[in-house]
A protein has these predicted regions:
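Class I SAM-dependent methyltransferase SAM/SAH-binding core
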Residues: 1-26
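A short acidic, Gly/Pro-enriched loop at the edge of an enzyme's catalytic core
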Residues: 25-37
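A short SAM/SAH-binding and catalytic strip from SAM-dependent methyltransferases
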Residues: 36-49
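A short glycine-rich, Lys/Arg-flanked "PGG" loop and its adjoining helix->strand segment in the class I
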Residues: 50-62
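Conserved beta-strand signature within the Rossmann-like core of class I S-adenosyl-L-methionine
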Residues: 63-70
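Short, glycine-/aromatic-enriched active-site segment of Class I SAM-dependent methyltransferases
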Residues: 71-88
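Short alpha-helix
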Residues: 88-104
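Core SAM-dependent methyltransferase catalytic element
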Residues: 104-124
């Protein structure tokens, strides 16, 4: 949290940014509040992926976008070594993320891969 506050100091001072800590499973925001949501290297650790995507869907405005970006895309056995080193980590393949997003109500799911990286976008 401290590093985030430091990196965003000016935006915070100008009232353009707020740094809050919470859980993606139960966010304390009203429905349809945000235009976009991002998840960089975090979905690996979410406890209940479908529930988390439903919660993000709830907080996005109609037409809002979610962007997920992961360094490990699950396409090789090398990715699994991380799950043995880091407790509680799950590496999802593109089809798993797409399925969970669609089940949560998202559409226009787009998948982009480059080397071992995976980026997924979807709209509410």
């Amino acid at each position: 949290m401290e590093k985030t506050r430091k990196l965003n100091r000016i935006a915070i001072q100008e009232g353009r940014c707020a740094v809050l800590q919470g859980s993606v499973t139960d966010m304390a925001f009203e429905d349809s509040r945000f235009d976009a949501a991002t998840a960089f290297e975090t979905v690996y650790f979410w406890p209940d992926l479908p529930r988390c995507f439903r919660e993000i869907w709830r907080t996005l405005k109609p037409g809002g976008t979610i962007l997920i970006c992961n360094e490990s895309n699950g396409d090789t056995d090398k990715d699994e070594r991380w799950t043995q080193i880091i407790g509680g980590m799950t590496i999802y393949k593109d089809i798993e993320l797409k399925t969970c997003l669609e089940q949560a109500g998202f559409h226009e799911v787009q998948i982009r891969k480059k080397k071992r990286w995976l980026c997924v976008t979807a709209r509410k």
